[in-house]
């Protein structure tokens, strides 16, 4: 957080210096420009301009240093691995973290939610126990976090993630000399995981979906209706008015993020205050302040959630796993929070009934909402080990 504090301090000083420079510049112009009687004012203007320029370059230097010194904390074990790696995946520069107590353990790729979300630091904080049993890989997908500039936002599609996810899988298989890897997908990442195991079943042992997305358009309609229902019970008239003004989703255009946020944030707050949910909410400030992210990455942490989500999410409304992915050749398990009202569990149960897979199952987390991996992390780790390593 020292870098953040320094950056903010320098930014404030730069703004003050710029304002001083502008004020002095206006005074010089009013006084008739450079003249012998105005020389002291001109000298002050030059000093202010130089100071402003120096602060700007100093701040840029702080940003640059923060980017090149970003790292993931070491793991103190003889055969451990703890690295941030920049990869070229289909011509797009992207970042992953690799963490494990033994680099010979099975590889587990965690697919973050979003699109546009990064959980590189969050997974390290919440699921460090998994690092004793796997080489845990976190991938900042195109348009998120450290990989925000991997592709122009306007060019990103679901196919982009599928292609790059496959390329990343091939890299991991080759680097760690493993024929297959394991997948965990969270929220949007759970749908991406289904896409990957469907298209490339030979590359994956098994997959776990948590906060599983099934039908994106129906999910938005159900979430909207749930928010209206809760708001009506609570007498939240202002929210009801805003929801009705926005209309029933799905939304399209430039305001998808902001319109969706009205009911999604409301549902998140509801789950965060639910007495049946353990360890509720998200530790966003802890995560964005983590050392994996440089200052520019920290800014892009939020840009991905806003810009990438807005562009990509509206492309997903035609996807319904029940129709398009009813048969898979890889074992699939669903880790569901009993109180998840973000990804409606009724859709997951329906998909689970019709899904044809070598093995399938639903694991309920009785004290969780949309994020069992945060709400009940100890049980989450135990169930991952049970599904992946003990069968």
Show where each model-derived region lies.
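Short beta-strand/loop motif that positions the catalytic acidic residue
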Residues: 328, 334-336, 340
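Conserved acidic catalytic loop of the alpha/beta-hydrolase fold
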Residues: 160-180
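The serine-hydrolase catalytic nucleophile loop
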Residues: 115-127
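Catalytic histidine-centered segment of alpha/beta-hydrolase-like enzymes
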Residues: 368-377, 381
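Glycine-rich "HGGG/HGxG" loop immediately N-terminal to the catalytic nucleophile
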Residues: 120-121, 143-156
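Conserved alpha/beta-hydrolase
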Residues: 131-148
